[in-house]
Amino acid sequence: MGGTRAVALLALGSFAMGTDAYAMAGLLPAIGADLHVSVSLAGQSVTAFTLCYALAAPLFSAVLARWGTRTVLVTALVVFVLANAGTALTGSYAGLLGTRALAGAAAGLFTPAAATAAVALVPPERRGRALGLVLGGMSAGTVLGVPLGLLVAAAHGWRAALWLITALGVAALLGVAGALPPVRGAAAPSLRARFGALARPRVAVVVAVTFTQTVAGLGLYTYLEPVLHRVAGIGSVVPYLWVWGIGGVCGSLLAGTLVDRTGKPALLAVALLGTLGGALALLPWAGAVPGLVLLPLVVWGAVGWAFVVPQQHRLLGPDAQGGAAAVGLNSSATYLGGAVGSALGGLALAHGLDAGRLPLLAAGVACAGVLLHLTAVPALARREARTGRPTTEHAHGAGAADATAAGAPERNAP
């Protein structure tokens, strides 16, 4: 099987994960009503998903990687299917939290393994596009899977939407188990090596900026329905989630091409983060004009999803051991940020904050990420200039992808 077809199978798995992760925002009111809890409390099921996603990659990947990348992917999909079936069957709030946590752990294992497999299956000059396709599969879940799931939920209840997601997981499982070729992945880094990557200043900056971006973007997305209802008087959020998802697909796919052509993932990342802050700040004001709210939504989706590609690209370099550890941490930061954002958003709403103010708070967090990037990266450059040599993290893993994009040779992961 060619590399492109194999990457497409990984994108199918990402599609199932994306549908699961992002459909929940539209299902929270129905879930809360069925289980007799508030929307903000039901939203903590998203926190459970994202928190376990964040913890799964560093805690379990080092052990499971001994089985091989393909086996890790299949295992993650099996757990994902069982967890979503459990969510569909649960009759208690505790059961909801437990099954969502299990689904999040499965997604946390699948996503970094899929990213690592994607770059191992294609030539170096196509790695940006391969990453974009895998991540685009997840954002495609928001365009096709989320609206379809919400329509099914409107007609047959929220549990039917979870059964649909379970079926998507089964399809992805059959495809990956039956057709994905063996993948030559990196040697599994130890837990100490994974967290030790944070001692590298450049890796730490990339991971910290990713964290701020997802606190803002994913945290706000969890409560998109009450936000849109407050700022624009919108009832059904299905078409608006669809617009957000279309932006996400376009952003994911275009970002990979931009990274490959420009060779400047760091510059692209900070530009995207600044644009995200502007789009979120515009959201409350755009809601006052009919139809205008679509503009910040599509921009938010596009730049939010596009941001992941240059960040991952900066961490996947010729030092496969360091790159795998850094990518796992970055994936963890992505969903840890979502968990923190969801938890803080739910807490704010539970304490009476006007839902229309949430986008402004999220915009402030995004701007803090821009400030962090603009101050930390030049400081590291000055440090390198003083010492007369690049920092270790620039030579190994974090900056290696930048060198590759600029034309330096890069080898496949051993």
PLM segments and residue spans:
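Paired small-residue
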Residues: A83-G86, A94-A103, G291-V299
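A late C-terminal transmembrane helix in Major Facilitator Superfamily
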Residues: P318-D354, A362
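C-terminal membrane-cytosol helix-exit motif in multi-pass small-molecule transporters
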Residues: T166-A186, L372-A376
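Helix-to-loop junctions at the C-terminal end of transmembrane segments
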Residues: A56-T69, G251-K264, L349-A350
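Cytoplasmic helix-loop-helix junction between adjacent transmembrane helices
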Residues: Y93, T99-M138
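Conserved MFS/SLC helix-loop-helix module at the cytosolic interface between two early adjacent transmembrane helices
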Residues: L55-G91
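C-terminal transmembrane helical hairpin of 12-TM major facilitator-type secondary transporters
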Residues: A266-P310
